[in-house]
């Protein structure tokens, strides 16, 4: 594993901010309107997800950046960036989401429905989240991350 950049507090803060806000909003909408969870179950799930999202935000950013670099080597096109964002989101978030739902007492059918729905919707969510994360990184003035850069300079360790 080669070091591509040092740990950067701005980067970690931007990744954490983006993950907590985006996951709370999209997760609640999916849980209540798609999987049939009650508002109370969803609120419990979203509340539990906050510390989890704080813990996984930076590792997700590292994973996403790795997939973006890998995808960019295959094709520098914008569709590859979108595909890389989608794949990163689905692969990283689905197991975490299933564990959160299990911990708050969702039934097996609810978990399967929520995770499957989230995986399908993640095609769009992963791309939207990638754009949101990019915007948060610019807002937090992450070093090496600027508006013109569609593929960020590595800020994390390469996987």
UniProtKB/Swiss-Prot annotation:
User: Where in or outside the cell is it found?
Assistant: Cell inner membrane
Q: Which domain of life is it from?
A: Bacteria
Keywords associated with the record? Amino-acid transport, Cell inner membrane, Cell membrane, Membrane, Transmembrane, Transmembrane helix, Transport
Under the heading InterPro entries, the entry gives:
Ala_export_AlaE
Q: One Pfam family name from the record?
A: AlaE
A Gene Ontology biological process in which this protein takes part is: amino acid export across plasma membrane
Q: Where are the transmembrane segments?
A: 17-37, 48-68, 86-106, 110-130
Q: Which GO terms describe its cellular component?
A: plasma membrane
GO MF assignments: L-amino acid efflux transmembrane transporter activity
Mode of membrane association: Multi-pass membrane protein
Function comment: Exports L-alanine.
**Family in the record:** Belongs to the AlaE exporter family.
HAMAP family referenced in this protein's UniProt entry, alphabetically: L_Ala_exporter
Q: What is this protein called?
A: L-alanine exporter AlaE
